[in-house]
Amino acid sequence: MLLLKKHTEDISSVYEIRERLGSGAFSEVVLAQERGSAHLVALKCIPKKALRGKEALVENEIAVLRRISHPNIVALEDVHESPSHLYLAMELVTGGELFDRIMERGSYTEKDASHLVGQVLGAVSYLHSLGIVHRDLKPENLLYATPFEDSKIMVSDFGLSKIQAGNMLGTACGTPGYVAPELLEQKPYGKAVDVWALGVISYILLCGYPPFYDESDPELFSQILRASYEFDSPFWDDISESAKDFIRHLLERDPQKRFTCQQALRHLWISGDTAFDRDILGSVSEQIRKNFARTHWKRAFNATSFLRHIRKLGQIPEGEGASEQGMARHSHSGLRAGQPPKW
């Protein structure tokens, strides 16, 4: 699907702006209705003056989205350009964020988590088949299509995605709690970084807190570099061995041994009937509330400081390390891996 930029003097001649939905680093998202129809879109409005020096980021996002058509991926429907703005008309999803929906449920089981992860795996497997690496998979980028109970899950936010022309990528980027060890070490990396992030997400979906978690950023990254995490009691006592085996294959430190999306889709926890059906909502929702509602999950991440501390720990030799330009957009901190939350 080729979407050419449509030039317009005034976007209000194309869409009626209904209300503000949110904002990003250099854009605002509004609910808009197409003139002459009842069709609604999420219109991403990007001032050109805010784009100076960042044009490649938006062009990359458009290039990636133009190639994608999948039922579990938020679609780019149109691109408009005015003298002052660039506008991306995105498919409107109305079901809310992943964690919010889990908290609102009447019950939640391991089978529900398996179904969610399977949908995301299918979408990411599709991206990988096109040579696209998302590079920023995290719960905030997983949205429900509708408010209904049977709604599908959607993958969003392709601002850091990359079309992998060769075998490997080199620029370090992503959100620290979800980045793979090879990315932190600034080794050449590929699609396996998305699988690692899905391992982190799967872990959280089953207990409500992350596998790598510390108040100290250097310790957090040291844990990731060592792939050091635990299935803590009592939080994991009622979770199946199949689920734990699945997560171990996704959080494999060696990207060559880590599952691909296709291998993950074939694992019995996804494709079979090994996921338990007992209600874990109480425990999971309590931990999500404690671990993800706090502002320290959103604070800015200082890549330069991280590199300095990690080198002191001897994890990355001098002269190597993550790119200080693209290292990350946000950080989280909290508990040590292997420790249950203490509040």
Curated annotation (Swiss-Prot):
Modification(s) after translation: Phosphorylated by CAMKK1.
E.C. designation(s): 2.7.11.17
Region (Disordered): 319-343
First-level EC class: transferase
Start and end residues of each Protein kinase domain: 15-270
Origin superkingdom: Eukaryota
Reactions it catalyzes: L-seryl-[protein] + ATP = O-phospho-L-seryl-[protein] + ADP + H(+); L-threonyl-[protein] + ATP = O-phospho-L-threonyl-[protein] + ADP + H(+)
Binding site for ATP: L21, G22, S23, G24, A25, F26, S27, E28, V29, K44
Subcellular localization: Cytoplasm; Nucleus
UniProt keywords, alphabetically: ATP-binding, Calcium, Calmodulin-binding, Cytoplasm, Kinase, Nucleotide-binding, Nucleus, Phosphoprotein, Serine/threonine-protein kinase, Transferase
Function: Calcium/calmodulin-dependent protein kinase belonging to a proposed calcium-triggered signaling cascade. In vitro phosphorylates CREB1 and SYN1/synapsin I. Phosphorylates and activates CAMK1.
Entry protein name: Calcium/calmodulin-dependent protein kinase type 1B
Taxonomic placement: Eukaryota, Metazoa, Chordata, Craniata, Vertebrata
